[in-house]
Amino acid sequence: MYQAKRERMIGKKILGERYVTVSEAAEIMYNRAQIGELSYEQGCALDYLQKFAKLDKEEAKKLVEELISLGIDEKTAVKIADILPEDLDDLRAIYYKRELPENAEEILEIVRKYI
């Protein structure tokens, strides 16, 4: 979950928080790198995000919106967009503590458009 102004220091507060895809997190970190030098940990995070982002930010955002329109909660939709499950077994891994939704095949059809 991305939190704007996450630091809890004097004069800083959390402005809001929302779930973001790996692609969007990579863009956030890249933009932060343009402002100033990243710490070692931030640099490693940026490298990881760039390696594992499977879609660009706009594609991922569109996929999440399509999944939410099917009634999937935002957190799960973001996870599906990050993993891009190819079959029911992959989708079951995301829903490991819950039952697969009845529209699981429809979810996979939508995801396949982005693979």
Curated annotation (Swiss-Prot):
It is found in: Cytoplasm. Its main location: cytoplasm. Keywords: Cytoplasm, DNA-directed RNA polymerase, Nucleotidyltransferase, Transcription, Transferase. It comes from the Archaea. GO terms for biological process: DNA-templated transcription initiation. The keyword Membrane does not apply. InterPro entries: HRDC-like_sf, HRDC_dom_sf, Rpb4/RPC9, Rpo4. Pfam families: RNA_pol_Rpb4. PANTHER family: DNA-DIRECTED RNA POLYMERASE SUBUNIT RPO4 (PTHR39646:SF1), RNA POLYMERASE RPB4 (PTHR39646). Part of the RNA polymerase complex. Forms a stalk with Rpo7 that extends from the main structure. DNA-dependent RNA polymerase (RNAP) catalyzes the transcription of DNA into RNA using the four ribonucleoside triphosphates as substrates. This subunit is less well bound than the others. Belongs to the eukaryotic RPB4 RNA polymerase subunit family. This is DNA-directed RNA polymerase subunit Rpo4. The gene is rpo4.
